[in-house]
A protein has these predicted regions:
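Outer-membrane beta-barrel transmembrane strand signature
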Residues: 203, 314-337, 342-348, 352-355, ...
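Flexible loop and strand-edge segments within Gram-negative outer membrane beta-barrel domains
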Residues: 297-299, 318, 329-350, 354-361, ...
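N-terminal periplasmic "start-of-domain" segments of outer-membrane beta-barrel proteins
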Residues: 56, 60-71, 125-156, 180-184, ...
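Extracytoplasmic beta-strand/coil segments of soluble accessory domains associated
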Residues: 161-220, 248-254, 259-278
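Periplasm-facing N-terminal accessory domains of Gram-negative outer-membrane beta-barrel systems
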Residues: 26-124
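Membrane-interface anchoring segments and C-terminal beta-barrel signals
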Residues: 866, 877-980
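Outer-membrane beta-barrel transmembrane domain signature of Gram-negative proteins
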Residues: 310-337, 479, 483-586, 636, ...
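Surface-exposed, extracytoplasmic segments of Gram-negative outer-membrane nutrient-acquisition systems
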Residues: 552, 659-667, 705-729, 756, ...
Length: 980
């Protein structure tokens, strides 16, 4: 027989063999399914006897799981004959395990009565851990936020609001007051001189856009024509695109020691958002939430004395507080979830319409989500997720901006009030600002697919592929013949910008569990990740129109355009081994190796090692009985922060010379040795529970040092470059502590009382600048990054002539003096929840201490002659008194540095759950009515409207100044949530 003939026979035999095997498998599959049974269980709260919804029941060692419905019932079908352990868990409760046995197609039943717990060592988490693992095995600190619990307490508008004061070490505060405005979101302080301080955010394993600053000036167009901020310092926040009602929980990795496996973008921590999923063996379960209410600024604008004065034409000056309105709010969400034996679904749709307290300003947002899962076999799970968002914002003009609406109203002089400028506006009439049209329109699709393969109970594989695609358009229109600057009347302008952003995520994680010895288990994780981000900005501006009614850029007499593009790619590999010594001691060792397109050409891959240990002492018999849980832990790890996409490149900027002849000039000098900033963090702490876990106490201390921090080094003029060269020569120390106490003070019958106390402190210091001399005072060795400095007063003379030509006057030092850090060094929050029967009351109070800010509004307002602290000292005829002259001349010489310390009633609510007997004929499930307030009242000494204001948006590094910004409003809501 020829070789070809022999090969044909072998192929034929192989085909027959595999065909028979496939046929037998297909024939056996129905028989196997015929021998499967069902597990049915009920889950209740041991303290109240009420059913627990959304608890997860898992057949240990398999992928078979289900979630409980509103009656606390779960059904798991397709369970093969045998003996199993069923594990039931829910955030806020101690998990329970029960044994069941199935013979053939029997039905096994189990009942679970869960106990509320202030400590959750057995809670399963997945972010940064190399696979799903109980918290008892982790040696670093992690925060988990249960969105269902948050929404039962208060109606939230966005995810940033939901995270505020919920996790120690996480700062989430509103820095602007308009609808859709950004928040400052950061974890454990500051670890860089110039790079973004926002944590990396993932949604169901997919990296997403979190931009929270204006994006227009990146095109370089501003040197061609007066352009091109759209809303001044006010910025939108892409995290606001998310629908809080779609979220199940949020996991927060607080620092480098915990986030090592995320590599070169994880220095600032990692936030992973998990959206809701369907339920196996569940008929369609509908949820409906409707919320109405309003936003209203606190009437504490410092212009209450304005109406006491009249202008030169007899116009009575207006108080800026008269601009405050009730901004209506409405939000509607509907969702359905369910599934069969091997498939589940969750789908939702939402619509929000929010108007600002200062008009014109609104946000209109529509969301749609579809999450599907399918188990084609017992070994494969396929999950698909998709979110579509359309978000339109009429932006408020605010923040270091000639056309800032409140800024013009508050910084006027009431003695200059006219019919056109009733606030005595120094720059732009408020009436003209209200005619401006500033919009942000974003369309966003975020989705992905995850494949889970479990060839054996001890061997799992997970592959995730996802995309975040954001298309954003911004526009600003100045109508013809309005006054939009100190120069007077303009002939109109239109700014138009487009931003296209996408982020691809590809992630693989394998995990193999095996026994080294009888009581020593190894959980070996391995995998890789590829990320690619791209951002393109296109800007056009048209200036000077022929007349009213013209608004197209192309119709303007003067036009200009600009474009910017950036792309960054990361590929990383990881390996980790977690050793379990019985149920008491766990040790983890791991490493991530990264390559990044932003690394210098002379720099290769970066290695990030980690190690942690967790010791559960409460498993030992010698522990006192009142200590129900006790884990001590320690961790050390590295994470990085990659440079900007083009920082390593030598670049040139195009210029027109010699009457339009194109040319180039040197721009960025580049650096082929540029490498990531690297933070090494050491952390230690404990988690403990007392009295059957009714009292939970957790504490952590951490010390982090950032090396290779990027510093801009000025080059000699002979080098010919316009900008400084980025070099890795800096070092920053960042250290702090965190503590929390959760106490189920009363859990008896109809009455419950739960209290939560969270405390944290943080300090940072510049250690080294590598000999580089920086301009300004914000970065100084031995002081905090972006510390606040000022020129102090050195003398006072009652007869010396000041800036207004009158006495008294002051003298100041020529040397800057350190005033304080820009971020709080101490944060605290105290939350209390009281429940009596179907009635629940909740309140959350927060405190911030230790920070200062540049209160530029205060001296500026005085120099304009319109600050209440100046007006109160004027004589009855309007002439300045000696005290008024003193105030005026002081603030003509000095900048104001004021305290950011404040105590705030951040959240308060009253909820009522309608008794089931009233709903029996309506087919409705659990129905709750909630009246709530956010940002209700605060106490401060800042001589400002709100100490948290920041004119430059939510991620504006190094800015601690509320100049012309708008404060966050009070928010009042009435919500109803029901299921059917």
């Amino acid at each position: 027989m020829s070789a070809m003939g022999h090969a044909a026979v072998l192929v034929h035999r192989s085909a027959v063999r595999y065909g028979l095997a496939l046929g037998l498998t297909l024939l056996a599959a129905p028989l196997a399914r015929a021998q499967t049974g069902t597990v049915i269980g009920t889950i209740t709260d041991r303290g109240t006897g009420q059913p627990i919804d959304a608890a997860r029941a898992l057949i240990v060692g398999t992928a078979l799981a289900a979630a409980s419905d509103t009656r606390g019932t779960f059904i798991i079908r397709g369970v093969r004959a045998g003996s199993y352990s069923v594990r039931v868990s829910r955030i806020g409760f101690r998990p329970e395990v029960a044994a069941v046995t199935l013979a053939g197609n029997d039905t096994a039943r189990a009942s679970f009565s869960l106990t509320q717990s202030a400590v959750e060592l057995d809670q399963v988490v997945v972010t940064g851990t190399g696979g799903a693992v109980e918290k008892r095995k982790i040696g670093s600190s992690m925060g988990v936020v249960d969105m269902a619990q948050v929404q039962e307490q208060v109606a939230v508008t966005d995810i940033g609001q939901a995270l505020a004061a919920k996790v120690t070490g996480l700062r989430s505060v509103s820095v602007g007051g308009g609808a859709g405005a950004a928040r400052d979101l950061r974890i454990r302080g500051t670890a860089s001189f110039s790079l973004s301080q926002r944590p990396v955010v993932y949604i169901d394993g997919v990296r997403v856009d979190t931009r929270a600053t204006e994006w227009t000036n990146a095109t370089g167009i501003s040197n061609k024509v007066a352009c091109c901020s759209f809303a001044g310092g006010t910025s939108t926040d892409r995290l606001n695109d998310l629908n809080p009602d779609d979220i199940e929980r949020v996991e927060v990795l607080k620092g480098a020691a915990a986030a090592t496996l995320y590599g070169s973008e994880a220095t600032n921590g990692v936030i992973q958002i998990f959206t809701k999923r369907g339920k196996n063996e569940s008929a369609p379960s509908w949820s409906l939430a409707a919320t109405t209410g309003f936003d209203r600024l606190r009437p504490n604008l410092p212009t209450k004395l304005f109406p006491l004065f009249t202008g030169p034409d007899g116009t009575q000056a207006r108080d800026a507080n008269s601009l405050i309105e009730n901004g209506p709010y409405q939000n509607y969400d509907v969702s359905v979830q369910g599934g069969g034996t091997r498939s589940t679904y969750f789908s939702s749709a939402g619509y929000m319409d929010q108007e600002g307290s200062i008009q014109p300003n609104y946000e209109k947002k529509g969301n749609f989500r579809l999450n599907l899962s399918f188990l084609p076999t017992d070994k494969w799970t396929v999950e698909g997720r998709s979110m579509l968002t359309r978000n339109t914002i009429a932006e408020e003009q605010a923040g270091n901006n000639w056309t800032a609406l409140l800024g013009n109203a508050m910084n006027g002089n009431p003695r200059n009030a006219t019919a056109q400028k009733p606030f005595g506006e120094a720059w732009v009439p408020v009436s003209d600002i209200k005619q401006m049209q500033t919009y942000s329109d974003a369309t966003r699709w975020t989705g992905g697919m995850t494949l889970n393969f479990t060839p054996a109970p001890a061997f799992t594989h997970r592959f995730t592929l996802g995309l975040d695609d954001v298309n954003e358009q911004k526009s600003r229109f100045f109508p013809y013949a309005g006054q939009y600057g100190p120069a007077g009347v303009t002939f109109g302008q239109r700014n138009l910008g487009y931003r296209f952003y996408y982020s691809w995520t590809a992630d693989y994680l394998g995990q193999y569990t095996f026994h080294i010895r009888r009581n020593i288990t190894s959980d070996l994780s391995f995998g890789g990740q590829a990320l690619k981000e791209s951002e393109r900005l296109n800007i056009a501006v048209g200036n000077t129109f022929a007349g009213p009614g013209v608004s197209a850029v192309s119709s303007a007499a003067v036009t200009a355009g600009g474009e910017a593009y950036s792309e960054k790619a990361t590929i990383g590999y990881l390996a980790q081994d977690r050793l379990s010594f019985g149920q008491t001691l766990y040790a983890t060792f791991g490493m991530r190796v990264d390559g990044n397109s932003a690394f210098g050409d002379n720099y290769g891959f970066k290695r990030y090692p980690k190690a942690d240990v967790a010791w559960v002492l409460s498993e030992y018999a010698f522990m006192p009985s009142f200590i129900s849980s006790l884990k001590v832990r320690a961790a050390v790890g590295q994470a990085g922060k990659a440079p900007g996409a083009f920082d390593k490149f030598q670049t040139f900027t195009a210029r027109s010379v010699l009457q339009g002849t194109p040319g180039v000039v040197p721009d960025n000098p580049g650096n082929g040795d540029l490498r990531p900033e690297t933070t090494t963090e050491q952390e230690a702490g404990f988690e403990s529970g007392f009295f059957h876990d009714r009292l939970g106490v957790e504490a952590s201390v951490y010390f982090a040092r950032t090396k290779d921090a990027i510093v801009p080094k000025l080059l000699p003029p002979s080098a010919g470059f316009q900008t400084a060269q980025n070099v890795n020569v800096g070092a920053i120390d960042n250290h702090g502590w965190e503590a929390s106490v959760n106490y189920l003070a009363v859990a008896h019958g109809a009455f419950d009382w739960t209290t939560n106390l969270r405390l944290d402190g943080n300090h940072n210091k510049v250690i080294d600048l590598g000999g580089v001399l920086l301009s300004g005072t914000a970065i100084q060795v031995g002081y905090p990054v972006q510390g606040i400095w000022t020129l102090p007063m050195t003398g006072y003379s009652p007869t010396a002539i000041g800036a207004n030509g009158r006495a008294p006057n002051f003298t100041r030092s020529s040397t800057n003096q350190y005033a304080g850090p820009p971020l709080p060094t101490f944060n605290a929050s105290l939350g209390n929840t009281f429940r009596y029967g179907n009635l629940q009351f909740y309140a959350l109070v927060t405190m911030e201490r230790g920070a200062v800010f540049q209160n530029s509004d205060r001296p500026y307002r005085t120099r304009q002659g319109g600050a209440d602290e100046y007006l109160q000292f004027l004589n009855s005829d309007g002439t300045p008194s000696f005290q008024a002259d003193s105030v005026f001349n002081y603030w003509s010489l000095f900048d104001a540095v004021d305290s950011r310390d404040n105590v705030r009633l951040r959240e308060v609510s009253l909820s009522y759950t309608i008794p089931e007997r009233f709903l029996a004929r309506t087919n409705l499930g659990r129905t709750q009515l909630t009246v709530s307030g956010q940002n209700v009242i605060w106490w401060d000494h800042c001589h400002c409207v709100d100490p948290n204001m920041n004119w430059a948006g939510g991620d504006a590094f190094g800015v601690a100044n509320g100049f012309l910004a708008q404060p966050a409003p009070r928010q009042y809501r009435l919500a109803i949530r029901t299921r059917f």
